[in-house]
Amino acid sequence: MPSHQIALPALSRRALFRQSALLGGAAALTSLPFGRQLLAHDVSENWPTVAAMANRYVSERKLANLLLTFGWGQEDHAHTVGGGNLSLAKPGAVDENSLYRIYSMSKPITGMATMILIDEGKLGLDQPVAEILPAFRDMRVLVDPAGALEDTVPANGPITIRQLLTHTAGLGYQIVSKGPLQAAYNQQGLVGGRVSRMPIPGFPVVTPAPGLAAWADRLAELPLMYQPATKWSYSCSIDLLGRVIEVASGMEFEAFLKKRIFDPCGMTSTWMQVPQSEAHRLTDNIGVLGGNVFPLDPAGNSIFFDKPEVPAGGGGLVSSPKDYDRFLRMLLGYGRIDGKFVMSEEAVRVGTSNLLPATVDLTGSWLEGEGHGAGGRSTGATFGWGGAAGTLAAVDFDLNLRSCLWTQYMPSEAYPIRDEFIAAMEADLKVMRAKKKAA
């Protein structure tokens, strides 16, 4: 089935996860008195600025399905703030079990799946990818990233697993590349995520490659945008890791995620393909154009009910707030959840740290002055990433806090909700600190 793509926008500004820098020394918040008595309840009274922001977006009908979740430490349930409806067109409130297209919030999951295999010795962090996928040996690099595909030079070194985890391999992306390389990505079906069954004016209809193995082979035939380990450039590298995981583990990518992450984390509502039996939980994804909203991927006819040709580790998952909070809780527990290890403490510590090669130039990139771990931004204290439909998730190891913004709209820059969410969190946490100090 053709995949209708829209340009998935820049996921954040430099300030995406800046709360760790502004809230230094706030680890004592973990002992604030919201405890067990508030589990599974709305905690808007503790987050009034966040709640006001959420209520404004919902009441103005800018968004339907806005929900914010917070969890402290290893609390076994996320607290919620806000909550609209599954759709702008009909009633039915969202909750922690509602289903959202998480797009690039898939990347930290694939990153941690890779870290599991590194921890087990089946992959090496600085191992050349060509040792796993020989087609990636002897890569070529475009002289001009937007120039002719024939105008190339040899790569100065091999692509490594570290580079794939951190978008420093020099690979392109259908939503980032320009000129002939972007056209080649479209022609070869090198898509990283699905948007809608409906045609979208102004955007190409792309037929995906017939499977993850074919997708990887086709990618290897195209030149890189940049020399490996020289520049941070948002790319399809996390999607390629799905194929690396298959070969290294001997399992299909989706099966590996289920066995090694979803099942042990207790994530029962995270899929590449939403079962029809769960259709009643799926939110609408809306488009925003000129201040007007329209159904982009309505839940009743969602493309996510179809089995994807290519399981996209960089942008293909649907999940629930409850499920993703359990993933964040596992990270915050350094690999442990409900008394059991999903992955080792070392694998989490390494995967959430700054893994950028020392030779990479971040000038002018989204990450300038910050770091990147296994599929997500790393600031030292925080780790996380966002999704193309407005979602945002992070763990803060200093605060012992897990937080997530849930909504569904495209393009994500249509509203400044991410920046507003972070600013609102900062304001409420400042009040919490003051109250604790006064007490």
Regions found by a protein language model. Name each.
Residues 1-15:
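N-terminal secretory signal peptides
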